[in-house]
């Protein structure tokens, strides 16, 4: 019985410590749900585990050409403006599927660092989508505000789109 009580006390102390850690990590976060705060706090461990296990890494092979050039396409920015991808010629372009309520939401921090560091050579385009377990429920305006306030995102975000049809 004493061991059980000791175990429960240790468990409660660990939980309380983790709750305090989550609050400290998110002290400057604005309008985040507790789930978003929790995911932001555990993101470094999630990324470490992902790298350790080799999950989410894929190398594409083959010489298959796309039916149309990327630079012949246009997209809608989340403010309603049209982005002509021809304007991006001469730069590397990174397309990223994003969501504000998933385990990888903190990737916005790293993406913004990349955008800042390579601003003359790299364009990052964020494509928010709600296809995966309702992880992007907000409107385009809410998404943009969330990303700017909590992660300092300045790279272009496209209109919320559908990845899976």
Residue ranges and their predicted role:
Residues 43-86:
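N-terminal "domain-start" segment that seeds a small globular fold
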Residues 90-93, 122:
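Alpha/beta-hydrolase fold active-site loops
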Residues 16-35:
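Membrane-interface motif at the C-terminal end of an N-terminal transmembrane signal
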Residues 104-165:
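Structural microenvironment flanking redox-active thiols in thiol-disulfide oxidoreductases
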Residues 30-52, 138-140:
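Periplasmic c-type cytochrome electron-transfer domains
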Residues 91, 98-101, 128:
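Short pre-active-site segment immediately N-terminal to redox-active cysteine/selenocysteine motifs
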Residues 1-14:
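N-terminal Sec-pathway targeting helices
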């Amino acid at each position: 019985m004493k061991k059980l009580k000791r175990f429960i006390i240790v468990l409660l102390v660990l939980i309380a410590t983790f709750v305090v850690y989550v609050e400290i990590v998110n002290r400057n976060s604005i309008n985040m749900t507790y789930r978003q705060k929790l995911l932001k706090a555990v993101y470094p461990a999630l990324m470490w585990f992902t790298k350790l296990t080799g999950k989410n890494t894929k190398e594409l092979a083959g010489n298959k050409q796309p039916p149309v050039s990327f630079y012949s396409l246009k997209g809608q920015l989340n403010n309603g403006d049209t982005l002509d991808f021809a304007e991006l010629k001469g730069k590397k372009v990174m397309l990223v599927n994003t969501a504000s309520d998933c385990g990888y939401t903190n990737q916005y921090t790293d993406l913004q660092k990349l955008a800042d560091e390579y601003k003359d050579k790299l364009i990052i385009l964020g494509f928010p989508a709600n296809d995966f377990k309702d992880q992007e429920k907000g409107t385009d305006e809410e998404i943009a505000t969330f990303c700017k306030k909590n992660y300092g995102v300045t790279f272009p975000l496209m209109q919320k789109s559908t990845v899976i049809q």
